């Protein structure tokens, strides 16, 4: 989900982390997914960010907006121009749906990798084999349990696994703000929460650039106790959504091994054990 102001804070948190300050231990092994909206907000700053990542041997992968419409033509042309100007510093793109695959094929950025997000639903070996023709890697589906995820692993098709981050419960073209009140597109949208009958708060991120919402789980997914079971099988992925600069830094330091105390209280292990039917 795009929230350029949160992304700016998260970028600052990353720049203060061990992953940035001590790049030698992760040289060539670290991949950073950068939100396209965040980069397009300030093209000159985007160039500096992409160049600095290349200098530190950190892979830059551009994450496209979750929902795109025909009216986004002008936005896409601006984005394509920005990407072309900085193509030397970009390693690839993240595709969250089939429309992204078609768009990237149309743009034809030769030599750039495409990584599928978990929303592409590679639920079994058949779908995995289908996507091999279009992707250079993929993210394991959040809905499958650990055993089911292992069943679709293929050494010839690199997989990543989300080990931290708020799980998106829904990506919707309907806006919570507009439905409950009125449309209020603004430069810095106020945070919204949905509250259930148990008084749990579910953060809502509004993307006013493309007019969609992402509703996140009330607590983050955290598989810090499961990491040893996946060592050597997948690449671990940290997803930052509602975190500010300090929270981002604390989570990064914990998973970097430089912080001993878990920086958050409540968390969920998602479908790691039970899966879905």
Positions of PLM-derived features:
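Active-site pocket-lining/capping segments in soluble small-molecule metabolic enzymes
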Residues: 2-277
């Amino acid at each position: 989900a795009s929230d350029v102001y949160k992304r700016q804070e998260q970028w600052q948190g990353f720049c203060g982390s061990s992953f940035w300050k001590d790049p030698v231990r992760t040289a060539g092994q670290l991949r950073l997914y950068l939100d396209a909206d965040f980069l397009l907000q300030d093209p000159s700053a985007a160039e500096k960010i992409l160049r600095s990542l290349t200098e530190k041997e950190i892979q830059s992968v551009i994450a496209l907006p979750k929902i795109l419409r025909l009216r986004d033509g002008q936005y896409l042309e601006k984005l394509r121009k920005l990407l072309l100007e900085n193509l030397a510093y970009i390693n690839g793109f993240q595709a969250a749906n089939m429309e992204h695959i078609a768009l990237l094929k149309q743009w034809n950025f030769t030599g750039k990798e495409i990584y599928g997000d978990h929303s592409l639903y590679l639920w079994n070996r058949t779908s995995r084999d289908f996507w091999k023709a279009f992707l250079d890697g993929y993210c394991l589906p959040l809905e499958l349990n650990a055993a089911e995820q292992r069943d679709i692993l293929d050494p010839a098709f690199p997989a990543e696994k989300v080990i931290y981050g708020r799980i998106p419960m829904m990506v919707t073209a309907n806006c919570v703000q507009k439905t409950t009140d009125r449309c209020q597109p603004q430069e810095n949208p106020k945070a919204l929460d949905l509250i259930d009958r148990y008084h749990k708060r579910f953060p809502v991120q509004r993307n006013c650039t493309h007019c969609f919402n992402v509703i996140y789980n009330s607590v983050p997914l955290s598989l810090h106790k499961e990491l040893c079971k996946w060592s050597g099988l997948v690449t671990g992925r940290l997803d930052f959504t509602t975190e500010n600069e300090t929270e981002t830094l604390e989570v990064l330091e914990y998973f970097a091994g430089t912080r001993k105390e878990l920086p958050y209280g409540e968390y969920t292990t998602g479908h790691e054990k039970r899966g879905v039917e």
